[in-house]
Amino acid sequence: MAIKTYKPTSAGRRHQTCSAFDEITTSSPEKSLLLTLKKTGGRNSFGRITSRHIGGGHKKKYRLVDFRRNKIDIPAKVASIEYDPNRSARIALLHYSDGEKRYILAPLNLKVGDVVLASTSADIKPGNSLPLRAIPLGTIIHNIELKIGKGGQLARSAGTFAQLMAKEGKYAQVKLPSGEVRMVLLDCMATVGQVGNIDHENVTIGKAGRSRWLGRRPKVRGVAMNPVDHPHGGGEGRTSGGRHPVTPWGIPTKGYKTRKNKTSSRFIVKPRTK
């Protein structure tokens, strides 16, 4: 994948970059795998904002992506590599030998015409899905399950990957993109390879309007608010907030740990790097 730059025809265009979409092979998605997406504006069923800075954005359809990879021992041919507006990664349309069609996350170097397989005895090549017990140590993997049969939940963003570090008892130790080393059951499925679209992190948004196209609303600073709205609000003229940085609800921010101990904490062998 390449990054496309623009001539500085305006202030917003000057630093803007965009994907060249070289790997995309079709512009129209598979209609049988589309769902309508309803916008929430970050509101819950009471109409109250539960997720700030969400709203607007381009209308889009949801693509049903197969994270489970539960069609075991049935080969599938890659029919196309497509754009998905709901995620940073590209998706690949698979045509299975029994006639079914499904989308999967497109790994790096997966091409149209390739054959992929989900099996305990599949080859170790990008796009193939296997249980962790059947994958050699040191292999680069993505789309990793945390619960058997639930579907992949880890390492799904563009360019991300995890690495299988060790196997001990009924658990495998997997190094995640954050640097965390975590124990995962050996019977959980994972897909071989790195998620594609690796240059996604190098894209520059360039202007505020492009963030709005993505459904992201502006983030207002606390010091620019009134005292009723934020602990940093108020004061005559410009102020620094007058206290250590806090959230709108008074919880310290900038490094303060808010994660509570939970049952799954015992599966973390090494915490994520700072």
Swiss-Prot record:
GO process terms (BP): cytoplasmic translation
Gene3D superfamilies: 2.30.30.30, Nucleic acid-binding proteins, Ribosomal protein L2, domain 3
Keyword RNA-binding (UniProt): yes
Record InterPro entries: NA-bd_OB-fold, Rib_uL2_dom2, Ribosomal_uL2, Ribosomal_uL2_bac/org-type, Ribosomal_uL2_C, Ribosomal_uL2_CS, Ribosomal_uL2_dom3, Ribosomal_uL2_RNA-bd_dom
Chain positions covered by the region annotation Disordered: 223-255
Keyword Nucleotidyltransferase: no
Assigned keywords, A-Z: Ribonucleoprotein, Ribosomal protein, RNA-binding, rRNA-binding
Short name of any one Pfam family annotated for the protein: Ribosomal_L2_C
Assigned GO CC terms: large ribosomal subunit
Family membership noted in the UniProt record: Belongs to the universal ribosomal protein uL2 family.
Record function comment: One of the primary rRNA binding proteins. Required for association of the 30S and 50S subunits to form the 70S ribosome, for tRNA binding and peptide bond formation. It has been suggested to have peptidyltransferase activity; this is somewhat controversial. Makes several contacts with the 16S rRNA in the 70S ribosome.
Name of the protein this chain belongs to: Large ribosomal subunit protein uL2
Biological source species: Geobacter metallireducens (strain ATCC 53774 / DSM 7210 / GS-15)
